Amino acid sequence: MSTGKIIQVIGAVIDVEFSRDNTPKVYDALNVKEANLVLEVQQQIGDGVVRTIAMGSSDGLRRGMVVENTNAPISVPVGHGTLGRIMNVLGEPIDEAGPIQYTETRSIHQAPPAYDELALSTEILETGIKVVDLICPFAKGGKVGLFGGAGVGKTVTMMELINNIAKEHSGYSVFAGVGERTREGNDFYYEMKDSNVLDKVALVYGQMNEPPGNRLRVALSGLTIAEGFRDEKRDVLMFIDNIYRYTLAGTEVSALLGRMPSAVGYQPTLAAEMGALQERITSTKTGSITSVQAVYVPADDLTDPSPATTFSHLDATIVLSRQIAELGIYPAVDPLDSTSRQLDPLVVGHDHYETARAVQKVLQRYKELKDIIAILGMDELSDEDKRTVDRARKIQRFLSQPFHVAEVFTGNPGKFVSLKDTVASFKAIVNGEYDHLPEQAFYMVGSIQEAIEKAKTL
């Protein structure tokens, strides 16, 4: 095992000098035993000097400290021993529940599966959330992005998806907390524990307080564990909250590594880094990885390079809108902005497809009429347009739904609505079967039956 010494420390980026014959390879993990710190090699500068990123805090490091080369990349344990445990980026347990029992470790840097290994699936995963099942259904083995600005409900919507799918789904789940609030990680752990599904979930956390090197790699650590389960012929759910923080960590590190920034100050390697992660989240002939990723949208701008780069990798995009959240409609999903490749008559069936498009058509017409209503009022509209507006407002309210994970805040018990009920209900509203009910009856209910019951009390 070759050793070197630290020659420069600039925040999270540390230069280490080795002898010329023993220069470490890119991505090799280096150990600073004295500071109990792991470094990852990013660049070879020449003359035996390598530039590395610290996986922990670089406080207290000084020049001349001895560094050992492990001659291998960072590796994490895979397999059943990781279930029910909270790990850090290095795969070390941080839940104070003793060491992890494992028989195999894997490097966090893996090549994506070969083309002939890939498998496509069109089997729809039922989420029980009306707006998602109707407008942007997602397939087993698909990739879903939850886009939204600050405070519109990404994490709550994701927690509800985890609650509804992970509990119904008999397979394993991996949750990677990338640069998010430690409190949310804590809440999630106890929620899984209370629902008795903790023994089917592996948790990998690199939260907001961690240095950028850690946040840049923690998504890969979580993904490696998910790949381990997939290669055991299992169907895995992979949850990443938040993919934007992964990009942001890359931006923080990039400038320190001496790269020229590109658009909006992002790293020039943004697309390559995103591709390296996303191409590995895929289903093979042995098993599937279905991923749900929360994507923070800076300043609500979907054209920002980070969310824009993420878009191209996804099968379904669920866009959360601040305008809808302001109306008090939760989940604040924008049914006109959200899309899915699975919304195809050959996949979801003719009835579902026609209903979803009819709902979007009514909402789009309402959006166009809003300006006229604001200037001239409802009275100036034709009878047909008045009917459209009336139905659109009912649809808008019926797209709201009480969540299981939000019961403690709202006092409303959560509702799981089957796909069959969802399609039938919206079809009936669009066809005018419930024109006689007041629009308040449709707000924050599960099935249409509940709306009918609620109307009797109004």
Swiss-Prot record:
Location in the cell: Cell inner membrane
SUPFAM superfamilies to which the protein is assigned, alphabetical: C-terminal domain of alpha and beta subunits of F1 ATP synthase, N-terminal domain of alpha and beta subunits of F1 ATP synthase, P-loop containing nucleoside triphosphate hydrolases
Gene name of the encoded protein: atpD
EC assignment: 7.1.2.2
Source organism of the structure: Francisella philomiragia subsp. philomiragia (strain ATCC 25017 / CCUG 19701 / FSC 153 / O#319-036)
Name this protein carries in UniProt: ATP synthase subunit beta
Function description: Produces ATP from ADP in the presence of a proton gradient across the membrane. The catalytic sites are hosted primarily by the beta subunits.
GO molecular function, one term: ATP binding
PANTHER family linked to this entry: ATP SYNTHASE (PTHR15184), ATP SYNTHASE SUBUNIT BETA, MITOCHONDRIAL (PTHR15184:SF71)
Quaternary structure, from the entry: F-type ATPases have 2 components, CF(1) - the catalytic core - and CF(0) - the membrane proton channel. CF(1) has five subunits: alpha(3), beta(3), gamma(1), delta(1), epsilon(1). CF(0) has three main subunits: a(1), b(2) and c(9-12). The alpha and beta chains form an alternating ring which encloses part of the gamma chain. CF(1) is attached to CF(0) by a central stalk formed by the gamma and epsilon chains, while a peripheral stalk is formed by the delta and b chains.
Membrane topology listed for this record: Peripheral membrane protein
A Pfam family assignment: ATP-synt_ab_N
Catalytic activity as recorded in UniProt: ATP + H2O + 4 H(+)(in) = ADP + phosphate + 5 H(+)(out)
Family that this chain belongs to: Belongs to the ATPase alpha/beta chains family.
Chief place where the protein resides: membrane
